[in-house]
């Protein structure tokens, strides 16, 4: 699932902006979150970039993260970047993305239900989330 997410977000800056909020840290590996955060920083650092290039992004991310990560973590990150660059989406790719979005909505609904239980919200908010 991690490579599906990276593939989708690497397609365009718009895709990253559109889908990043649905990708929760507990759903994907730590390296995936590092890469996604790096993509966001990459686009902010180079606003004129319109087409994502794995090679230049990899160099940017490794340079940026080398100050923060251990050697072992850098090796894991490099492996993840290499696999992400070579990833070819499979027939279930779209389903993976739908599942991520569904998981996010379910989490939001559960949080709102907790608020209803505590008395700080009402069922109208749950209904709005469930029907959007």
Where are the predicted features?
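Noncatalytic partner-interaction/assembly domains of nucleic-acid and motor enzyme complexes
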Residues: 1-103
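Interdomain "pre-motor" coupling segment immediately N-terminal to P-loop NTPase/helicase cores
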Residues: 82-132
């Amino acid at each position: 699932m991690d490579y599906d997410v990276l593939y989708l977000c690497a397609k365009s800056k718009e895709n990253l902006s559109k889908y990043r909020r649905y990708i929760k840290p507990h759903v994907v590996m730590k390296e995936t979150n590092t890469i996604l955060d790096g993509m966001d920083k990459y686009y902010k650092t180079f606003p004129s970039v319109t087409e994502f290039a794995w090679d230049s992004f990899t160099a940017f991310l490794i340079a940026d993260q080398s100050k923060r990560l251990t050697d072992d973590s850098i090796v894991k990150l490099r492996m993840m970047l290499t696999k992400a660059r070579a990833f070819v989406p499979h027939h279930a790719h779209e389903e993976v993305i739908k599942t991520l979005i569904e998981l996010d909505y379910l989490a939001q609904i559960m949080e709102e239900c907790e608020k209803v239980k505590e008395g700080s919200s009402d069922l109208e908010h749950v209904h709005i989330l469930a029907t959007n």
